[in-house]
Amino acid sequence: MIEADRLISASGGREEEVIDRAIRPKLLADYTGQDPVCEQMEIFIAAARQRGEALDHLLIFGPPGLGKTTLANIVANEMGVNIKTTSGPVLEKAGDLAALLTNLEPNDVLFIDEIHRLSPVVEEVLYPAMEDYQLDIMIGEGPAARSIKLDLPPFTLIGATTRAGSLTSPLRDRFGIVQRLEFYNVKDLTDIVARSARCLGLDMTEDGALEVARRSRGTPRIANRLLRRVRDFAQVKSDGRIDGPIAARAMDMLDVDNEGFDFMDRKLLLAVIDKFLGGPVGLDNLAAAIGEEKDTIEDVLEPYLIQQGYLQRTPRGRIATPRAYAHFGLQRPDEG
């Protein structure tokens, strides 16, 4: 199973990125949720603008689908500067990064997604650029090679990552501002769904937005994806208006339950409960029981179940929590 194939995957494809771009907020005033982050960024941006300086380099980390790219674009808009976007895997050679840096205007933003995947060679070039706004370039080869320094205009590097722990210490230490994005609560997600519905010209009630939000796993990207599928259902099966009952029927058809679980989430939990008496069960046995790769279980299925308190990893194996039993209306063996 590929994560991107799941309706409730937080990863987004290129086509979805284009659609989401049309409904993204452009300014902090339009950005819903992440209140501590927004409050801090508002102050940092205002101070940098008053001084006429580039904003300090910014690292944004957190689970996928929470709005790291959106926030980077908002920072550029609020600063009134251009943004150039790339990603860690794309920057294979030092020259790739140098080409981007030398084309920046004063105070521009360079946004690097998946910055934890930068190659060591590219990272070495980035250090003096971030610290001194200088670019060290090697001219020629062999004994005749020499290093020259190019001055760069002041700029802001914004790095985004889902794995802050994978960043090297020298790179992480060069960011003056570090922000973590958290999963969204249902209220904020409801507001996001309602705003997206307005941007798409949909007739949606508050309870319809709530129904989509509560099944979106705290993630705006999933909420917007579910909204588009609910729109399709309402268009074909009703008069196009999205209310609570219509949204619930659409979600049931899509096999996304009240907690945002899909078939694979439920299959894993029920395997632990039914086949292994609630656990503990080792990863090898669990993978064989549900017919999935071990990496898929560890990287795709388990994280959300653990975060929400439905599954525990222990030294002896996986254990289903009381909350998992309650979700399926089952009684724990020790309660029988």
Swiss-Prot record:
Extent of the signal sequence: none
Gene3D superfamilies, A to Z: 1.10.8.60, P-loop containing nucleotide triphosphate hydrolases, Winged helix-like DNA-binding domain superfamily/Winged helix DNA-binding domain
NCBIfam families: PRK00080.1, ruvB
Chain sites annotated for binding DNA: 313, 318
Natural source organism: Aeromonas hydrophila subsp. hydrophila (strain ATCC 7966 / DSM 30187 / BCRC 13018 / CCUG 14551 / JCM 1027 / KCTC 2358 / NCIMB 9240 / NCTC 8049)
CDD domains, alphabetized: AAA
Record: residues binding Mg(2+): 69
Source organism superkingdom: Bacteria
One GO CC term on file: cytoplasm
Keywords assigned by UniProt, alphabetized: ATP-binding, Cytoplasm, DNA damage, DNA recombination, DNA repair, DNA-binding, Hydrolase, Nucleotide-binding
Family: Belongs to the RuvB family.
InterPro entries hit by this protein: AAA+_ATPase (IPR003593), AAA_lid_4 (IPR041445), DNA_helicase_Holl-junc_RuvB (IPR004605), P-loop_NTPase (IPR027417), RuvB-like_N (IPR008824), RuvB_C (IPR008823), WH-like_DNA-bd_sf (IPR036388), WH_DNA-bd_sf (IPR036390)
Chemical reaction(s) catalysed: ATP + H2O = ADP + phosphate + H(+)
A Pfam short name: AAA_lid_4
Head domain (RuvB-H): region residues: 258-336
MF terms in GO: ATP binding; ATP hydrolysis activity; four-way junction DNA binding; four-way junction helicase activity
Assembly and oligomerization: Homohexamer. Forms an RuvA(8)-RuvB(12)-Holliday junction (HJ) complex. HJ DNA is sandwiched between 2 RuvA tetramers; dsDNA enters through RuvA and exits via RuvB. An RuvB hexamer assembles on each DNA strand where it exits the tetramer. Each RuvB hexamer is contacted by two RuvA subunits (via domain III) on 2 adjacent RuvB subunits; this complex drives branch migration. In the full resolvosome a probable DNA-RuvA(4)-RuvB(12)-RuvC(2) complex forms which resolves the HJ.
GO annotation terms (biological process): DNA recombination; DNA repair
UniProt region (Large ATPase domain (RuvB-L)), positions on chain: 4-184
Name of this protein: Holliday junction branch migration complex subunit RuvB
Keyword Transmembrane attributed: no
Region annotated Small ATPAse domain (RuvB-S), chain positions: 185-255
